[in-house]
Amino acid sequence: MKIASAFIHPEPRMRLEQQYALLYREFGERAAHPGLPALAALLACSERNARLQLAKMADRGWLAWRPGRGRGHRSELRLLLTPDEMALGDARRLVARGELEQAFARLNAPLRRQLLTRLPQLFAQDDDRSRLRMPIARPVHTLDPIKAYHRLEAHIVRQLFDCLCDFDAASQSLRPALAHHWEADADARRWRFWLRPGLRFHDGSPLDAAAVAASVLRLRDEDGPMRHMYRGLEAVETHHPLSLSFRLAHGDWLWPQRLYTVNAAIAPPARAADFDSHPVGCGAFRLQRHSPQRLVLEANPHYYRERPLLERIELWVLGGADSPSCFDLRQDAATRSPDDPLQSACTYLLPNPDGPFFAGDDARRRGLLRFLSQPTPLTAGDPEREPALGLLPGWRQPPVAADADTALPQGGALRLCTYDLASPPGLIRALEARLAGIGARLEVTRIAYPDFHRYRWWQQADLVLMSEVLHDDRDYGLYEWLGGNPGLRRSLPPGPRARLDADLLAIQQLPERAARMRAYQACADWLVREGWLLPLSHEREGLQAGDDIAGLRQGLSGWVDFRSLWRKD
């Protein structure tokens, strides 16, 4: 009987489990009568060692072995476990000891899925009230603040790092963080910040004005998804260890908000080669472990503000597998209801004006987007989403202004590109059904998340499906979306892009938030009316927590701040 081994990482020295796998491959589950010499030859050891190994396996309940004694009495061997059962048992013991990485490394993909189904029994044996476990759908690709773009990375970076300013979502206003005070000159071209004394990074190195200056200059000088947003920084001047100033090319009343974003989190000047995956931060949690299977955060005992209420947060990478209900907290839960909050922005379409279908024809681009939006392709009563009338919930943008005599081509194919986490099947089916009305076919290409943001696929795309989620500061979140989103900037030809940049430059010079919000709406009206961006839906944010989890404060990004979580008795 030949079977595939459950173990996929053999070691140079044969392990007991591998010896059992050899026996199972030779004899299977049937009763066998091998002599000790034959067993020693199979296990590549002496007869004495073979006898010892068989005794160990019998003690563990893997097999029953009765040696033959005397002439005519044959030995009898019966194997009681399949290698898969044995591998799972070994993995369960490792998980119970907290050795998740070793457990997964020893199993092939089907057995890993089986192990996940048995997690509830394993977790039930753990009564650690200071720990919280939650699943995540994919690995974390970077923990360097200036590279963080997706909200998973952004949220974890916010737990590991702090910024000069913090933001209160309830009042939609800035509050002190690493800096306890800041002020601007009359035209907002020069900003000065004063730091709290005694600040340190997780490794004990000082967090002073020089460290802040070096960290902020990275935003302007190093490659990152939001580098474009800091091009107006002309110079940084340190006055003394607790104070520094920023000189800007243009007046910018949004400068403190720029320094609140996750990309502006303060990193140490000296960074190890593995900083991208194992960073040293300054936030409420510090990184204890980062492996392909798990991310572990531990409370920072020297945090300058209120200490987190939990000691340990574990994020388990489950890939596409369904997460068992035994986890304490589940973000983006599959089961949603109309009572769940809507995401802070929307899922939307970007047309590629130079793609194969549009080929620079503006009338065709506007005509197709109007056809896709009038009426909404979504069906009523969908618990996971609502039709988007504008970029934000509650906003209403004008319809796409298509030319009356624009005739849509009948038939053909349009290629839609998206990334895995922004491709709700119901929404894509609705677009397919709408296009079928003109005999057109939608070819959907789902691109792995890191590759999506390299945009090497752009020239082959006609439409791009994306999703935007703002952070708690809705004001600067809109500015960042309109001015810094790489997909939107690629979709705009030079003329419209220059107009949007000019509008945003004017917005940053408005000192009042209300005036800026009106200006954002005007930008959104223009983008939608001209067919450069089409809001489709507002997704609902699913969040499920155990009955004993308290302190749930869900921000506009949909994530819960780990610092406020605690367990009820």
Question: Model-flagged regions — what are they?
Answer:
Residues 76, 227-270, 284-289, 294:
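Surface-exposed binding/hinge segments that line
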Residues 28-32, 42, 47, 51-53, ...:
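Aromatic- and charge-enriched surface segment that lines or borders ligand/interaction sites
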Residues 135-184:
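N-terminal lobe/hinge region of extracytoplasmic solute-binding protein
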Residues 302-344:
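Ligand-site clamp/hinge motif
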Residues 139-153, 205, 255-261, 544-563:
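A structural "hinge/loop" feature
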Residues 29-37, 43, 47-49, 61, ...:
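Ligand/substrate-recognition segments at binding pockets and active sites
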Residues 367-399, 422-430, 459-569:
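Detector for C-terminal structural segments
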Residues 298-301, 341-367, 371:
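A bilobed periplasmic-binding-protein/Venus flytrap-type ligand-binding module shared by bacterial periplasmic
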